[in-house]
């Protein structure tokens, strides 16, 4: 929901196609939301500022693709536990509409950043794979972002998620930006990153972030352009095992960076 909110650029937004029920043959991953998950998804959307949520779907298709899947109603056309839970959330909103109206999400001190170039390049690299390591899959960048979300949340802070193109780099004081395994750092963002750090923002970078520019040139060759901002430059990355530990307690995956 944060991704949608930031890309709405301050405009009202809805969240659509929230999963209503079980999937069997469709969907990338077999999954059925529990009633508790449904409530969590709805309240998360509301807390992010969404003005509405649309499920996919109320009832299942009867034939062909997605037949018997995704519905809030069961096969007997009775409300599922998910639909009953959604009704409870709607009831709270109806009873306390005036209290919710006009509320806006409080800005978080930590923002997790992604960029489209990283997703495109990661997907392109994954097309040639013969092995199954997570860090080399097309989903690696966004899974790293999800892992960072879990890690920051475990500290007691709920982070925001934003595209680098919509992040307010000028609002640096007291803020932390995390770039989790974003394999590309397009040239347009480099002066913004430097300005953010220079003006007091804290920057945390993980994985192979900045390995490429937007044209898939390796940035670590011929002088890393963000050396002064990052405080160091990488001389090389070495495969160190699928899972290993950096120092005494920092879990890592696949590559070890040598400074």
Regions found by a protein language model. Name each.
Residues 149-170:
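A short, well-structured beta->alpha microelement
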Residues 1-142, 236-241, 245-251, 255:
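Hydrophobic targeting/anchoring helices
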Residues 9-13, 48-53, 155-160, 173-175, ...:
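Loop/turn elements at helix/coil->beta-strand transitions in domains of secreted/extracellular proteins
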Residues 19-23, 59-61, 116-119, 166-167, ...:
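Short, solvent-exposed loop/turn segments at secondary-structure junctions
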Residues 29-32, 67-72, 174-179, 218-222:
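Short low-complexity, flexible loop/linker segments enriched in glycine and/or proline
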Residues 34, 180-259:
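A conserved amphipathic helix/loop scaffold
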Residues 16, 56, 113, 162, ...:
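Generic beta-strand/beta-sheet core signal
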Residues 3-6, 44, 151, 192-196:
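Alpha-helical scaffold elements within enzyme catalytic domains, especially in hydrolases
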